[in-house]
């Protein structure tokens, strides 16, 4: 067996296993519960060389396969840990791995993952001052180095900085989540605070190279070019279209203020410093292996897209690719194919593009589904929605079917009148301008706090739809700063344009199809084919997606004949 990885189901461990397997190595993965195999399969990794073994590093180890390289990526990371809980993994566990590695006759290297703020310290760490996590990591680092010298174990310590990438929802991710939700009123630290990053892909490639390098090294693996924290947060804010805090609070003041006021856990504050780190040896090893770090700004933007898509660990993206793009001045959240979609799907209120997930799964060909400007995850624009739509479709090289829902139907009609050559057909699902107006309460300012406080269950009940991931996604957006207010404004704006939209509908020159639910029927006569789905309400694509897809397909076949 080439290598064994402890902590193989963790964020670093699982990616390291994937990297080693991709390199053709035979890998033993030490797990308590095997969630690793399914994750590797989801990443398309060939697991023929993988052996999963059960083990608990908090206990003395035995019965594990003989290997050449040992990686300990296991750690108990959390703030507010008890001392014994933290030491069990970060000190005792680290020593148990080392003691077992020392018995291996063919051991080439023990690679111990420490931390950029905890390595190369002396003395006994102060648990009361540092907190259990950081203190236990410091103690474990010192203990592993000392015991390795005693047992003459070939050891390399790798000290990564803040590791970012898909699936990372702790550490810096919590700061980004506060920024995204509008809770980050001021930046912690000062103008020179340095919180370096490294991507998970780069880190595991680096780790895979370590056993062939000389033993006894300490490698600080981080991007020296990471922007200082204020600039870093500003870059993420610009990318995601949210305001960046203009004020900062010095760490010294944060330590003195009550946690209820600052929202900052005391243990997080020691990571906010202006320190720099000795990266020369790590950069030399990377250069010899041909490894290059991706630009920090690009890595942060890609990670921010991943965080928003996954709702910071609370959900799973329903389609890829996804991310923020500038459309008519709006940082717009876009899901799907931007260049050759067969269908372009525009959501209605109060939903976002996730509304279309059940229908999209039943449609042939690629789709493009954005969040409308100012709604869902998209930032606002000063342009009319139809102008924004024209810019959204400017890279599109096909003539897709434009499918709009509810209040998006008005802008879709205006776009179809102005740009008939850009689309092949217009489908209006529950067009609000042809239906009864929304209740007065939904248009009032009283609706704003109600929407912000609504649980997903209450929202689903109000809309008459199942409480699925689509509704949970919408409820999460409505809690963000400004979204509920913009939804209420959009309801009023849409109502004011009903007469204009009805008049423009007769000027659309491409084929038009209308789909409504029987409990939310049309209240105005139309000269276009209209389909009524029995038992459906205002959101037939959620409650009856198969029937909506069937009607869309039937119309396409008819047009193609």
Model-derived segments and their meaning:
Residues 3-23:
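N-terminal Rossmann NAD(P)H-binding glycine-rich loop of SDR-like oxidoreductase domains
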Residues 50-92:
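NAD(P)H-binding glycine-rich loop region in Rossmannoid oxidoreductase-like domains
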Residues 72-73, 92-132:
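Conserved Rossmann-fold NAD(P)-dependent oxidoreductase catalytic core, especially the SDR/UDP-sugar
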Residues 148-195:
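NAD(P)-dependent short-chain dehydrogenase/reductase
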Residues 229-274, 293-296, 451:
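Terminal hydrophobic/aromatic helix or amphipathic segment near a protein terminus
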Residues 279-330, 555-557, 561:
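Amphipathic terminal alpha-helices
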Residues 369-403:
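Active-site loop/oxyanion-hole signature of alpha/beta-hydrolase fold enzymes
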Residues 508, 514-516:
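Short beta-strand/loop motif that positions the catalytic acidic residue
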